[in-house]
Structure formats: C-alpha cells, structure tokens
C-alpha cells in the first residue's frame, strides 16, 4: 500500500565459550544473543501520521559478570589491599564474612579455618569454579507516535512508550574452588565432615547441589516495567510569536534483588539441612 511502510531487522550473535573450567569440564564466557526490530509507518491522511516501533533482545548464555579475580590472601582482610595477588585466588576465609557465617553454622572445629588454598590457575582462559555463570536477559520496547496537523499553523505530536526488562545472573562469587573438607564443630566428637544437600538462589533463579566444601554464589534478579507518555502542541505562525506546550508522564517499577549465599548461610537458614540435626534429635 502507498500509505503503509514497514521495516524488519533481525540480528544474532553466537560465540563458543572462551574460558575452560577444569572442575566441570565445561567452557563458558560464550555469547548467544538475538534481537529484532519492526517498524510500521501509516499515513492515515494528509494531516495525520502514525508510527509504531517494536524491538526485542534476548541473551541466554554463560557470560560472567566479572571475568577473573585476584587476591593476595590475608587472614585479617581476606585479601590484602596492598597487593594484587594471584589470579583465580579466593579470599582467606578467616578475614571474610563467609568465614564468620560458616563458624556460626558449625562448619569449623573450634576456630575459623581458611578453606581456600593457593591460586589454582595463572591463565585467563582457564578458571577453576564450582559452577559456570549463567546469564539470561530479555528486553522489549514498544513505541507509538501520532502526528496530527490541527491546522496549517499548529501540530500535535503524541507519544507512548512501554518497555520491560528481565535480567537474571548467577556467578561463582569467590572466583575459585575450595578443596578443604568442612571438618565441623563435631570433629572432636568423632563426627564425619559436614556434607549437605543445599539449595541456592531465589524463586526466579535457583539450583540445588551437594556441598561438602565452602562455596559462595551471587544472584542478581532485576525486573523492570517502564511507561512513558507525552503530548506536545507546536505552532508555526508567520509572525514573531510561536509556542510549544506539552505534558509528560513517566512511571517506572523496578524490582532489584541481589543475593550472596554460602554453604554457611544456607545451613543457617534451615538447621534441618545440617547433618548435625539428626545428631541433636537423637540425644
């Protein structure tokens, strides 16, 4: 039709993982992106035009939020702030909040034990992690614009925009792997090291696994809904006087949740998950 014009564009970006995790044997830091854009221009009449634009983008891969971490272990600070330290090195548990939480959760035999040894890798393409990161993001934007010539000298422009964004990311927060067993507060009584089946994450993004060493994960969940509307009246008189008047409305709702969870935090959350719960129940 002479009074209707449309355009459609599509893109995709795919790449294999560039970093290898020897713990799981998997590669990560890949890319899997897809996007599209559709627009429609409709000449309703000689004085009225309508434009519709819709765009969407989705990413679903294993890209990290941060690539690597460096740390020079320090029993007070966790990581010595004066030195960069080694790559793929976790903080000393004795100077980290994870150590305190683990102590409260009875993971240590009396005093807090550093649960992370020396750096496991000195290569950027090889990192030892309990789990690879996950990245999922979906965003959509719809824009509607109506232009109408009220007269030869006055034009009205009305716009409305609606957009949403869902973002979910998980990371191995400590950036390394612990190989130190969780001796537990019951070690002096001859009880075996702690091992528990624990669930990490949120209602939007979670997993469960058997934990027999310390580990720290972080979870980011963001959901956004945005609405915008505006109307403008613009004059184009021949004389010295012209005007521009309008009204703008904006509404945004965002739920942003960030969690950091360790073996200790999950055991504190439910003592029934601790192997010591059966011991206490049997007393």
Language-model-detected regions and their locations in the chain:
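Beta-sheet-rich non-transmembrane sensory/scaffold domains
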Residues: 128-131, 139
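Short acidic-aromatic active-site loops that bind/stabilize oxyanions
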Residues: 12, 132-133, 217-220
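Face-selective signature of the C-terminal outer-membrane beta-barrel domain
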Residues: 138-166, 213-283
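Solvent-exposed loop segments that connect transmembrane elements
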Residues: 19-27, 64-128, 174-219, 259-283
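Transmembrane beta-barrel wall of Gram-negative outer-membrane proteins
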Residues: 1-109, 141-142, 224, 228, ...
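Short catalytic/ligand-binding loop motif for oxyanion handling, primarily in non-cytosolic enzymes
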Residues: 59-62, 168, 254-255
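Generic N-terminal amphipathic/basic segments
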Residues: 66, 134-137
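Short, solvent-exposed loop/turn elements at domain surfaces
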Residues: 121, 126, 166-169, 241
């Amino acid at each position: 039709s002479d009074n209707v014009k449309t355009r459609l564009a599509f893109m995709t970006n795919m790449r294999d993982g560039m970093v290898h995790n020897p713990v799981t044997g998997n590669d990560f830091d890949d890319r899997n992106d897809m996007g599209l854009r559709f627009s429609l221009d409709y000449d309703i009449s000689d004085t009225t035009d309508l434009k519709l634009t819709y765009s969407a983008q989705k990413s679903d891969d294993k890209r990290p939020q941060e690539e690597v971490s460096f740390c020079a272990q320090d029993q007070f600070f966790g990581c010595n702030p004066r030195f960069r330290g080694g790559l793929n090195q976790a903080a000393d548990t004795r100077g980290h909040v994870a150590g305190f939480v683990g102590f409260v959760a009875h993971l240590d035999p009396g005093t807090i034990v550093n649960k992370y040894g020396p750096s496991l890798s000195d290569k950027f393409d090889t990192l030892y992690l309990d789990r690879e990161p996950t990245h999922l993001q979906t965003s959509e934007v719809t824009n509607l614009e109506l232009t109408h010539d009220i007269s030869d000298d006055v034009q009205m422009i009305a716009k409305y925009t609606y957009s949403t964004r869902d973002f979910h990311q998980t990371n191995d927060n400590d950036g390394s792997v612990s190989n130190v067993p969780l001796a537990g507060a019951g070690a002096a009584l001859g009880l075996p090291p702690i091992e528990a089946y624990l669930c990490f994450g949120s209602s939007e993004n979670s997993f469960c696994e058997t934990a027999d060493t310390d580990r720290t994960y972080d979870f980011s969940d963001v959901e956004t809904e945005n609405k915008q509307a505006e109307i403008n009246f613009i004059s184009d008189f021949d004389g010295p006087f012209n005007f521009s008047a309008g009204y703008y409305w904006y509404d945004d709702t965002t739920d942003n949740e960030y969690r950091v969870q360790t073996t200790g935090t999950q055991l504190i959350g439910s003592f029934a998950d601790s192997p010591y719960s059966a011991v206490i129940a049997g007393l």
